[in-house]
């Protein structure tokens, strides 16, 4: 299952998110989206977890949780059209 993680502090790294999500199960990948020209974080990321039940538990427990001074938005990612 692909997960959207938003409202992230700009200092958060992919390894930080990977560590948090691994508390709920296996994580295939984490990708923080950055501005092409400055390489600065846009404040959101996508993660892929193969087990839907583990991903759903992570979504339920992490959505609205505070991390690095900001309240995260965590939900199932909507595929591009």
Q: Which residues fall in each region the model found?
A:
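Intrinsically disordered, low-complexity RNA-binding regions enriched in Gly/Arg/Ser/Tyr
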Residues: 1-42, 48-81
């Amino acid at each position: 299952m692909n997960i959207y993680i938003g409202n992230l502090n700009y200092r958060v790294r992919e390894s930080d998110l990977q560590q948090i999500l691994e508390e709920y199960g296996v994580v295939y990948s984490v990708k923080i989206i950055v501005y092409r020209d400055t390489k600065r974080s846009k404040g959101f990321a996508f993660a892929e977890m193969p087990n839907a039940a583990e991903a759903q538990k992570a979504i339920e427990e992490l959505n609205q949780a505070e991390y690095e001074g900001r309240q995260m938005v965590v939900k199932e990612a909507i595929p591009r059209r």
